[in-house]
Curated annotation (Swiss-Prot):
Basic and acidic residues composition-biased segments: 1-14, 86-100
Keyword annotations: Phosphoprotein, Repeat, TPR repeat
Location of Phosphoserine modifications: S19
Stretch list, region Disordered: 1-24, 86-146
Descriptive protein name: Protein KINESIN LIGHT CHAIN-RELATED 2
InterPro entries: TPR-like_helical_dom_sf, TPR_rpt
Family: Belongs to the kinesin light chain family.
Cited Pfam families: TPR_10, TPR_12
TPR repeat coordinates: 147-181, 200-233, 243-276, 285-318, 329-363, 369-402, 411-444, 454-487, 495-528, 537-570, 579-612
A GO biological process held by the record: regulation of defense response
Domain of life of the source: Eukaryota
Biased composition (Polar residues): 102-111
């Protein structure tokens, strides 16, 4: 069962990169270290605000969206499309401050304080939400008592909080200090624009500490408030402070699994940045790429492609004429991933090669190795296996030399090679690479994100499943599930793993157990609050098959019908996954005595398969025989007994050997 091998790679790459803000980041990026770096940068910016009157140091934090000083928690470690139960969509503030004689409007753009005119918003982009978030304070703020009202005290408190976070000694103490700093800036900053920015900065740091403690629900109202304070017409610094809050809140929603809310915040942040910096600023290009990666994680490839092309065009315009910049290389790597997911493997390969050349020219060896893995993926999709092996071995050598032989990036390449050798029938070599990868994943090096380990288990499980070693496959899926147990914002990921476990138990003939596992997975998908994806549709189809084996025919029909509706919308009526559901639904209708409906669906399936696969294809021939049998029975007025459902249902391609997992 799968949603396409290329889509699986998207999930894999997303997990490896950790945060779409850093497509070139190393594979072993850790959350804690990234958060510490962000805290230090935020504190540095606050200190600069106190010591310089010539230039607002908040600009160093908010304008620059690059690696040097971006407001980036690097906390977004998505392995799948995940969601929280019952969360409502949030609307963000992007409105002008009310004037004494009336309200401002986003459409009434004014020159910024430095004389720079605001660029017009592109009509092709979504309009920014205009409704205000209700002002919400963290419940902890009311417990803080601060007598002093000097802004210098706030800076000192933030410094102490930063030192505690950096040392990792006591995040709770750091939280107390950050809360006191916020209270100080609240008392002394009323009516002072510059001190208002101090408050915004302290709120960002407070939210980062909440995130480090896993208190995402407490971080959200803090960030909402940080967006509410700065007003766009107060100047560039304030507008970009609002931008930073949008991006950080988007990260937080991503952590909580609310992907649609996350994308909405990123889109709003991009619109603010474009207004302030103009359409062609390089930093706007970086944000376009960031938003594109978020769309990739949501499997929204067309929108991702559009945004990535915007980023590529901007970075081309800002780069040197002779050589491609590292930013352009990152854009091309992402564009290759998007094209790969869409099945455009030749185009993907072209982008990967250009990205690799640009990175090589600037001695980014490990980044080149990561791209070599993607090049190997494209070659494997094109059945150019020798070239794929060469690309993987090249990446493997670099990772071993640069990161060590027990690093998770080495294990990742082992898994790629295991998959390749399995595809070409070299089972012994495939098992050897699986075992080498498992040795690393079972004893990961310190600092390895456990999400990477879980992803590795899922990948290797799929290979064992295709070898029909189902016990080992199920064992690894259970290990992966244990890693995600009780993790916040991972409901969809857990549901995907459970769905794959349902497939394996189905293949083992444990139909009742398979049904129960699918039921749990479907429940999690329904409660996630996210839109229904192709993954959900495939899981419904599989649960329907389990119902067939348990002779729950009516329930099976309901599940197939729901799966049909979802897959028609997400994949289209000609996609193999959709056709598989049509075929299953036709068999179910026949078993229920709805012969005319069954014939109508099966005629469509046969016609489509003939058009796409050719009349000589074995799959087409089998469908034609099924249709002929139904027509013959309809001609003689079938009334007394129905053909057994299990003889009519085609072997589902989703659970055939050699398929990739759903997650």
């Amino acid at each position: 069962m799968d949603v396409g091998e290329s889509n699986e790679r998207v999930k894999d790459d997303s997990a490896l990169q950790a945060s779409p803000r850093s497509p070139l980041s190393s594979i072993d990026l850790a959350i804690d270290g990234a958060m510490n770096a962000s805290i230090e940068q935020l504190y540095h910016n606050v200190c600069e605000m106190e010591s310089s009157d010539d230039q607002s140091p908040s600009r160093a934090s908010f304008i620059s969206y690059g690696a040097e000083s971006r407001i980036d928690l690097e906390l977004r470690h998505l392995v799948g499309d995940v969601g929280e139960e019952g969360e409502s969509k949030k609307e963000i503030i992007l409105e002008k401050k009310e004037e004494s004689n009336g309200e401002g409007s986003l459409s009434q753009k004014k020159p910024l304080s430095n004389g720079k005119k605001v660029a017009k918003t592109s009509p092709n982009n979504p309009k920014m939400p205009g409704s205000r978030i209700s002002s919400r304070k963290s419940p902890d703020l009311g417990k803080v008592s601060v007598d002093e009202e000097s802004p210098e005290l706030g800076v000192v408190l933030l410094k102490q909080a930063r030192e505690l976070v950096s040392s990792g000694e006591n995040l709770n103490k750091a939280l107390d200090l950050a809360l006191r700093a916020v209270k100080v800036f609240e008392k002394c900053g009323e009516g002072e624009k510059q001190l208002g920015l101090n408050l915004v900065m302290s709120l960002h740091i407070l939210a980062a500490i909440y995130a480090g403690l896993g208190r995402y629900n407490d971080a959200v109202p803090v960030l909402e408030r940080s967006i509410e304070i700065p007003m766009i017409e107060d100047g560039e610094d304030h507008a970009l402070a609002k931008f930073a809050g949008c991006m950080q809140l988007g990260d937080m929603y991503g952590l909580m699994g609310q992907v649609e809310n996350s994308i909405m915040l990123y889109t709003a942040g991009l619109e603010i940045q474009r207004q302030v910096l103009g359409e062609s600023d390089a930093r706007v290009g970086e944000t376009c790429r960031y938003l594109a990666e978020a769309h990739v994680q949501a499997m929204q490839f067309e929108e991702a492609s559009r945004l990535c092309q915007m980023a590529l065009d901007i970075h081309k315009e800002n780069g040197a004429a002779a050589t491609a910049s590292i930013e352009e290389a990152a854009d091309r790597k992402l564009m290759g991933l998007i094209c790969d997911a869409k099945g455009d493997y030749e185009v993907a390969l072209e982008h990967y090669v250009l990205a690799s050349m640009a990175m090589s020219s600037q001695n980014h060896r490990e980044d080149v190795a990561a791209v070599d893995c993607s090049i190997g993926d494209a070659y494997m999709s094109l059945a150019r296996f020798d070239e794929a092996i060469f690309a993987y071995q090249k990446a493997l050598a670099v990772f071993k030399q640069g990161k060590g032989e027990t690093h998770s990036s080495v294990a990742l390449v082992y898994v790629r090679l295991a998959d390749l050798y399995n595809k070409i029938g070299k089972t012994r070599d495939s098992k050897s690479y699986c075992e080498n990868a498992l040795k690393i994943y079972l004893k990961p090096t310190p600092g390895t994100p456990m999400e990477e380990v879980a992803t590795g288990f899922i990948e290797i499980s799929a290979i064992y499943q295709s070898m029909n070693e189902l016990d080992q496959a199920l064992k690894l899926l259970r290990r992966a599930l244990k890693i995600y147990a009780n993790a916040p914002g991972q409901q969809n990921t857990i549901a995907g793993i459970e769905a794959q476990m349902g497939v394996v138990t189905y293949m083992m003939g444990n139909y009742s157990e398979s049904y129960d596992i699918f039921k749990s997975a479907i429940s999690k998908f329904r409660n996630s609050g996210e839109k229904k994806t192709a993954l959900f549709g495939i899981a419904l189809n599989q649960m329907g098959l389990a119902c067939v084996q348990r002779y729950a025919i009516n329930e099976a029909a309901d599940l197939f019908e729901e799966a049909k509706t979802i897959l028609e919308k997400e994949c289209g009526p000609y996609h193999p996954d959709t056709l598989a559901v049509y075929s299953n639904l036709a068999g179910t209708y026949d078993a229920m005595g709805r012969l005319d409906d069954a014939i109508e669906i099966l005629e469509y399936v046969v016609g489509t398969r003939e058009e796409k696969l050719g009349t000589a294809n074995p799959e087409v021939e089998d469908e034609k025989q099924r249709l002929a049998a139904l027509l013959k029975e309809a001609g003689r007025g079938r009334s007394k007994r129905n053909r057994a459902l299990l003889t009519l249902l085609d072997n589902n391609p989703e659970i055939a050997n050699g398929q990739r997992p759903v997650y």
